[in-house]
């Protein structure tokens, strides 16, 4: 599929569908735990199909899991029944550790499962693009060096950080290449940790590396979609745009209207209904009100697509998800009616 044309189609669509990061809640219809899900390519592919069957979204998305890449490098990963796996400890502490760090082979850890998930999803889903997920270079390096430590090390030991980033980027390029060969139409590259950096440091320690990934792998048939759910990402917009990405997904605490106004008109901006306060909130009515508010604010920008501010957790109340989709559909339907009489 020509994904540049896909972007244009989304921009020109006056009746835009909702496009939340929705995959993990498939466990509710498959009666499996999150741990069982993320360790089975068949379960994950089936979950993607079931979500696609239930909701009209412009693409099918796989599972955001920021532990996979670091685990492949040898970091300790903790699995719990109903939580997304997490990395603990600090694999790289010194320059010597960074120098000794080996770039994993493709297929290490759970990367083979993630790639096979995409391959199986292409057998099940034929009516929309399929998007894989991976961590960005700085977010991967942060899990290898410890999230808090790496922020300090960008000042005190930048050479060590760059050593780890070089190896993380080399592996991520191989990993995304595996998704591409498996049939994915793009990948959502999650780089939230970079949102904690200053603009100059973000450029040096994240965006330049993401640009390398984009230059190597993005083409008309494969998109790199940039995800950063950190606070205040509007201040980092020049650094985000420098990555070469054309689709940006931002979090609940971003000024999404400022971001929409700041990107070229042929770039898509997705976001940013709060997961923690709205999707995981107390009532479907609150979901409806928050969704309507964001639609009224941004729906007249053609390159805006309403989404969740981050990936939606497995235990979300599906009534809330249903209300979100219905509210978006109703909002664009009413706009169409207004267009007919104005």
Can you annotate each of these PLM segments?
Residues 76-81, 87-90, 142-151:
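Short, flexible, mixed-charge acidic loops at enzyme active sites
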Residues 32-40:
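Surface-exposed strand-loop-strand hairpins of Gram-negative outer-membrane beta-barrel proteins
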Residues 32, 69-82:
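Glycine-rich loop at the start of a catalytic domain that most often binds anionic cofactors/ligands
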Residues 66-69, 84-85, 137-139:
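A short acidic, glycine/proline-enriched capping/turn motif at secondary-structure boundaries
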Residues 23-28, 65-69:
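Short active-site-proximal "capping" loops at secondary-structure junctions
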Residues 45-63, 178-182, 242:
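Catalytic domains of carbohydrate-active enzymes, especially glycoside hydrolases
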Residues 82-120:
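A gly/proline- and charged-residue-enriched helix-loop-helix capping module
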Residues 1-26, 34, 104-342:
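Active-site loop segments of alpha/beta catalytic cores
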């Amino acid at each position: 599929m020509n994904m540049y044309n896909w972007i244009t189609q989304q921009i020109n669509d006056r009746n835009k569908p909702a496009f939340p990061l929705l995959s993990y809640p498939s466990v509710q219809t498959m009666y499996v735990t999150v741990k069982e899900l993320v360790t089975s390519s068949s379960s994950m592919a089936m979950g993607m199909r079931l979500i696609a069957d239930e909701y009209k979204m412009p693409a099918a998305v796989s599972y955001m899991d920021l532990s996979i890449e670091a685990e492949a490098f040898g970091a300790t990963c903790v699995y719990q029944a109903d939580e997304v796996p997490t990395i603990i400890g600090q694999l790289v502490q010194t320059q010597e550790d960074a120098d000794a760090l080996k770039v994993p082979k493709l297929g290490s850890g759970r990367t083979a499962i993630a790639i096979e998930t995409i391959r199986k999803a292409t057998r099940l889903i034929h009516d929309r693009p399929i998007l894989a997920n991976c961590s960005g270079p700085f977010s991967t390096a942060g899990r290898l060096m410890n999230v808090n430590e790496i922020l300090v090390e960008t000042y005190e030991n930048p050479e060590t950080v760059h050593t780890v980033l070089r190896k993380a980027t080399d592996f991520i390029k191989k990993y995304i290449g595996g998704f591409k060969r498996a049939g994915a139409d793009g990948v959502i590259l999650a780089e939230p940790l970079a949102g904690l950096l200053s603009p100059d440091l973000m450029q040096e320690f994240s965006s330049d590396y993401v640009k390398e990934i984009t230059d190597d792998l993005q083409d008309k048939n494969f998109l790199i979609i940039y995800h950063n759910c950190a606070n205040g990402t509007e201040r980092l917009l020049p650094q985000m745009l420098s990555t070469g990405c054309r689709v940006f997904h931002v979090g609940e605490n971003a000024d999404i209207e400022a971001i929409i106004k700041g990107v070229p008109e042929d770039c898509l901006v997705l976001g940013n209904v709060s997961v923690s306060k709205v999707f995981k909130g107390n009532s479907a009515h609150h979901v409806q009100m928050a969704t309507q508010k964001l639609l009224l604010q941004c729906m007249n920008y053609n390159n805006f697509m309403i989404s969740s501010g981050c990936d939606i957790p497995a235990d979300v109340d599906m009534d809330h998800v249903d209300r979100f989709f219905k509210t978006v559909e109703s909002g664009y339907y009413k706009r169409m009616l207004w267009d007919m009489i104005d």
